[in-house]
Amino acid sequence: MATPNRLWMALLLLGVLGVLQTPAPAQAALQPNFEEDKFLGRWFTSGLASNSSWFLEKKKVLSMCKSVVAPAADGGLNLTSTFLRKDQCETRTLLLRPAGPPGCYSYTSPHWSSTHEVSVAETDYETYALLYTEGVRGPGQDFRMATLYSRSQNPRAEVKEHFTTFAKSLGFTEEGIVFLPKTDKCMEEHP
C-alpha cells in the first residue's frame, strides 16, 4: 500500500501533467503579405465574438458601427469609430501602433488603460477583414475578441459563415458570437 506522501506526490504530478497537456487558446494567424494601404478606408463592424462578461451581458443592445482606418503621423493607424450610444452618435479614435510583423498592432484601451494587441488575421481588402484582439483588463480578466469588418452594411451570408468558423476556431462559442444589426443613425455610406 502506498504511503500518503507518495499518493499526494502522484496526484500532484498527474495534476501538473494534466495542466501541461491542456491546450492553450488558439491563436489567430496573420494575413500573409499584409498590405496596409489596401486596408485603409471605411469599414463597418458587422460581427463580434468575445469571452468578455461585459460583452455577453451587452451584446443584445449593440449595433453596427462605422470605422475609418487612416494613416497616423507616427507610421501607425488611426482607427476612428462612430457608433450610436444613448441615441447620440459618438466618435472615438484609437491609435494602432505597429507591434511586430505587418498587420499586427497594439493600442491602449481608453477604459482600462491596458495595452491590447490586435492583428488582421485575414482580409481580401475589398469585402471583409477578420481581426483578433487580446489583452488583459485587470487581474484575472483576460480579454479576447474576434471582429468582422465589412466594406458594406450587408455582408454576404458566406462572409458571415466564414466569420463564425473563424471565431469558433479561436474557441468562442455560439453564445459569444453576434452579428450586429444595422442602424439608420451614424452610418453614412461616405467615409
Curated annotation (Swiss-Prot):
In the male reproductive system, expressed in the testis, epididymis and prostate, and secreted into the seminal fluid. Forms a beta-barrel structure that accommodates hydrophobic ligands in its interior. Glycans are attached at residues 51, 78. The lineage of its organism: Eukaryota, Metazoa, Chordata, Craniata, Vertebrata. Catalyzes the conversion of PGH2 to PGD2, a prostaglandin involved in smooth muscle contraction/relaxation and a potent inhibitor of platelet aggregation. Involved in a variety of CNS functions, such as sedation, NREM sleep and PGE2-induced allodynia, and may have an anti-apoptotic role in oligodendrocytes. Binds small non-substrate lipophilic molecules, including biliverdin, bilirubin, retinal, retinoic acid and thyroid hormone, and may act as a scavenger for harmful hydrophobic molecules and as a secretory retinoid and thyroid hormone transporter. GO terms for cellular component: extracellular region; extracellular space; Golgi apparatus; nuclear membrane; perinuclear region of cytoplasm; rough endoplasmic reticulum. It is an enzyme of class 5 (isomerase). Monomer. Its EC number is 5.3.99.2. Disulfide bonds join 89-186. Residues 1-28 form the signal peptide. Keywords: Cytoplasm, Disulfide bond, Endoplasmic reticulum, Fatty acid biosynthesis, Fatty acid metabolism, Glycoprotein, Golgi apparatus, Isomerase, Lipid biosynthesis, Lipid metabolism, Mast cell degranulation, Membrane, Nucleus, Prostaglandin biosynthesis, Prostaglandin metabolism, Secreted, Signal, Transport. GO terms for molecular function: prostaglandin-D synthase activity; retinoid binding; small molecule binding. This is Prostaglandin-H2 D-isomerase. InterPro entries: Calycin, Lipocalin, Lipocln_cytosolic_FA-bd_dom.
